[in-house]
């Protein structure tokens, strides 16, 4: 089981504004907060966002470089994916792969894909009828 993930960000304030509503919607609660970071916990796992030092901001994040590609979260249902999609649109957050949405991951993969302020790709995936089948 995953204990935690720590992500360094370019602007902690923007990051928290972006992630707070989404993580709260998924059942996460604020766990820790300090001058240069914040964490959100769900069960025993938590997600940490830390302000990167100025000297490390010159090379922006890109998901195709070595390192993290994206974060994927469980949705409660297809309807939940649709509800979150509507909120994203209301907030002006672009939906990735719009021409294939909500099946950008495949015909049996109902999800919404979007990016946070640092362009970290985020995915919210509905349960599949095929999950658990090997």
Q: What do these predicted regions represent?
A:
Residues 8-53:
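Core segments of cupin and vicinal oxygen chelate
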Residues 1, 64-68, 106:
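Short glycine-enriched loop/turn motifs at secondary-structure junctions
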Residues 26-35, 47-51, 76, 91, ...:
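Long, contiguous binding/interaction regions
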């Amino acid at each position: 089981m995953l204990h935690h993930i720590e992500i360094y960000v370019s602007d902690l304030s923007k990051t928290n504004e972006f992630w707070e509503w989404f993580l709260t919607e998924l059942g996460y609660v604020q766990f820790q907060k300090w001058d240069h970071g914040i964490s959100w916990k769900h069960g025993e796992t938590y997600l940490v966002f830390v302000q990167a030092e100025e000297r490390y901001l010159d090379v922006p994040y890109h998901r195709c470089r070595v390192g993290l590609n994206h974060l994927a979260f469980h949705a409660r249902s297809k309807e939940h994916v649709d509800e979150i999609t509507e909120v994203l649109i209301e907030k002006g957050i672009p939906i990735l792969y719009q021409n294939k949405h909500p099946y950008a991951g495949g015909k049996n993969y109902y999800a919404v894909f979007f990016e946070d302020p640092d362009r970290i790709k985020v995915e919210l995936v509905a349960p599949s009828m095929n999950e658990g089948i090997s």
